[in-house]
Amino acid sequence: MRDSSVLHFERVSVSGNFQFSFDDVAIVSIVACDAPNIVTSDEVDARLAPFYERVGAEPGLLQNLAGITEHRQWPEDVGFIEASALAGEKAIVESGIDRSRIGFITNTSVCRDRLEPSSAVTVHNRLGLSSHCINYDISNACLGFINGIHMAGTFIEAGQIDYALVVDGEGTREIQQNTIDRLLDESSTIDDLFSNFASLTLGSGSAAAVIGRHSENPGSHRVVRGDFRAASQHHNLCVGSLESMRTDTKALLDSGTELGKVAWDEADKDAWGDMDRYIFHQISRVHAGAMIDILGIDPERVPMTFPTYGNIGPAAVPFTLAKEVPSLKAGDRVLCVGVGSGLNASFVELAW
């Protein structure tokens, strides 16, 4: 007889990708905002010098292993919400639309100052959006922005709104200071460096996109279709807060690339094997190389921003895409690719 005080769950064995397609959804504008303060990896190593000497470790992991030479930070008076609003304003201006037509705004940032209210509601206020504009956060680790585009497209395709604004603002000052302080503590070990290493690879920045109907916005870029896939058995491999980020680096790399390959094999990989650009979530040289190899794609078509910006979380994909816009031409086919903590994988096809 089962104990009624204990919940029992049955595992579902059905496997597969979640797939979607849109007929008339497009990116009207997409922008990136650089955090202005540059922090080099050499500067981080200099701060960690007492730790390296004490545990007998060599500096240079950020550059030699992760391939990150520098990252950015916001000034102390610029918070996550301000960073999101900065990108949102820029995206609205570049889109050329009247902001009163925006019917949905979502903030997809990992970084947040509070549990409630949402970050989106403050960005809504800062940008002077209408009272009919739905506003809430979407939180899904580094895939949040891609989920935001999908949600926006769903609203538009259903005829419920005309335009949506997806924003994201990330900052690293607090978590990296906490990580360095923790490593400089006399009790820290080399194992602490490896379990906290991911927090040192993070970068600050913001991004935003206005989403609308392709038919109503000449020169916009279609959101064609996409795939999502979950492997939630790996939800403990990367767990983060503003205080710290604990990561099983090898297991995360192995499980993430495995999930990416399984999702790729079930998606339309033949059609996606020869895209003009692949916009990856930006983590490190090791992660990018592993995904390029396992998907069998041309590395020359994979632009990288992590060497000089670090991993900007959910902002990384739109940030990198926005940086790539000057080199894209009408007719180019673009695939956004991401694996986020949880684990979840995503592929979203764009027609430029």
Predicted feature locations:
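Glycine/charged-rich beta-loop-alpha catalytic/anionic-binding loops adjacent to active sites
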Residues: 69, 101-106, 127-138, 187-194, ...
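Condensing-enzyme catalytic core mediating Claisen C-C bond formation in acyl metabolism
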Residues: 2-77, 185-254, 339, 351-352
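Short beta-strand segments
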Residues: 28-31, 139, 164-170, 211, ...
